[in-house]
């Protein structure tokens, strides 16, 4: 069965850590492709700093040179709150022959009990769990709540890049460079669109 990874997020902005973890998961799990899915509105995040279409454009620019990466507009076109379960159900219906792998950071997975229809999600998707620097996942407690994760997940050590979109926005607001932190095409787009200014 073909394996495809999904990396969802606000990507506000997308940066090299996103790309590095996607590539790590692709290689370690033998994924034929990684699909980046920018969210329209995440239920656990209150604010976006750029529009969904600007974040979509930055994501397309960031992955342009990797043929194993693609972008889906499924959540942007849906608009409203983006629930992962809705996306996975749609992907399963459209392409039932694919084994879908959610690529998630350990810090995000720690909040799984707060995700909409989390138990259904664990039945439909597999999880590629990337360790987040400075965050220790309480794996036994998570398995107590979601025992099926033991068979439907792989923990990946991966590249430990302590880089966040919050930090990048702060740098941009302070007039500091983000070169070598985001792809050049993304940096150019941010400057052209005058994003993340104070």
Curated annotation (Swiss-Prot):
GO biological process: NAD biosynthetic process
Superkingdom of the source species: Bacteria
GO MF: ATP binding; nicotinate-nucleotide adenylyltransferase activity
Keyword NAD on entry: yes
Keywords for the protein's UniProt record, in alphabetical order: ATP-binding, NAD, Nucleotide-binding, Nucleotidyltransferase, Pyridine nucleotide biosynthesis, Transferase
Catalytic activity of the protein: nicotinate beta-D-ribonucleotide + ATP + H(+) = deamido-NAD(+) + diphosphate
Protein purpose: Catalyzes the reversible adenylation of nicotinate mononucleotide (NaMN) to nicotinic acid adenine dinucleotide (NaAD).
UniProt name for this protein: Probable nicotinate-nucleotide adenylyltransferase
């Amino acid at each position: 069965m073909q394996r495809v990874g999904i990396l969802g997020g606000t990507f506000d902005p997308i940066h090299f850590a996103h790309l590095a973890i996607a590539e790590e998961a692709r290689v370690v799990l033998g994924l034929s492709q990684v699909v980046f899915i920018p969210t329209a509105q995440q239920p656990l995040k209150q604010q976006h700093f750029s529009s969904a279409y600007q974040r979509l454009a930055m994501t397309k620019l960031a992955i342009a040179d990797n043929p194993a990466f693609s972008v889906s507009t499924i959540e942007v076109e849906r608009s409203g709150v983006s629930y992962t379960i809705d996306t996975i159900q749609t992907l399963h219906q459209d392409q039932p022959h694919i084994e879908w792998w959610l690529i998630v950071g350990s810090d995000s997975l720690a909040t799984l009990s707060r995700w909409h229809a989390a138990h259904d999600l664990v039945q439909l998707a597999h999880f590629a769990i990337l360790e987040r620097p400075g965050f220790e996942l309480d794996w036994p407690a998570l398995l107590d709540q979601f025992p099926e994760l033991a068979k439907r997940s792989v923990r990946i050590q991966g590249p430990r890049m302590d880089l966040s979109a919050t930090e990048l926005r702060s740098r941009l607001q302070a007039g500091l460079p983000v070169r070598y932190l985001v792809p050049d095409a993304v940096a150019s787009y941010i400057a052209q669109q005058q994003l993340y200014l104070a």
